[in-house]
């Protein structure tokens, strides 16, 4: 029996994150200051049911685990008001000169109609001497944000942590990974 040759790809760093709104006219928010991304599978766990006669196993019924999507955590190094608004569900106001003028969160006690978006995460492929030889793009569709947690401490920079939920439609893949030679411009 021949051994199967496997491809090994050394990956490092969060090179870039894009949040692309799923609207008639999509908006792309590029986050180049994100320093940590975590993707955790959201799973419907299967079950096992046994048919036993005392110490003898007669039969089993099994259902497999099913992936329903991913829960993503994005840590950013700076505050980006439009990204904060997209994730939290409120409205960010920017003046004519691009200056941040304010943010209003969603109304307390009411259902928030958050805009769905696709998340593209780019990470670097490295070689033996540390050079970047390419990128991998991880894509999760139909994401929605959750209410933001805010923690501000003396002596530390504010670093927002966003929690996102990706829930693909029936028949869609929960994740796609695409190799790229370079980052998009």
Residues of each region from the PLM?
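Extracellular-facing segments of soluble proteins and assemblies that are Gly/Ser/Thr-biased and enriched
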Residues: 65-120
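Solvent-exposed edge beta-strands and adjacent loop segments
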Residues: 2-89, 142-156
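Extended, acidic-biased charged interface segments
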Residues: 113-137, 169
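Exposed beta-sheet edge/beta-hairpin loop segments within beta-rich domains
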Residues: 63-65, 106-111, 127-131, 149-158
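Basic/polar low-complexity intrinsically disordered segments
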Residues: 28-30, 112, 172
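Short, structured patches in soluble enzyme cores that scaffold and shape functional sites
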Residues: 76-78, 123, 164-168
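Residue-level signal for secondary-structure boundary sites
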Residues: 80-83, 127-129, 148, 170-173
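Mixed-charge, glycine-accented linear interaction segment located at domain edges/termini
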Residues: 135-185
